[in-house]
Amino acid sequence: MTTLSVGIGGLLGVLARFGIGRLTLHHEQLLWSTVWINVSGSFLLGLFVAGGWFGRDLREGIGVGFLSGFTTFSTFSVQAIQEVDAGEPWRAFAYVAVSLVGGLAAAAAGYALGRRLA
């Protein structure tokens, strides 16, 4: 059952990510939508890991499946390199800084909230 829940969760996460990507028509919108996706995914993963709610199958379906399919480190990495290549090193720096600091802060906030609610 865990394999099935991870597969279904992953499919739903990828579809959600794809849908948001289709809504962002311009390069700059895509860049910041990736930040939003990764930061919100970090918060939710922290929340679910610390909260310990649900059974193992659903937790892994959400965490390993949906949130892993929804968030994307590879897109983050390539977009940062593309900004540098386009002559926008400061935009690349801001993108990386906001992504990393925002992701860590969101994960910490989600984790703290999950522990408090558990």
Please give the residue ranges for each predicted region.
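Membrane-interface helix-loop junctions in multi-pass transporters/channels
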Residues: 1-118
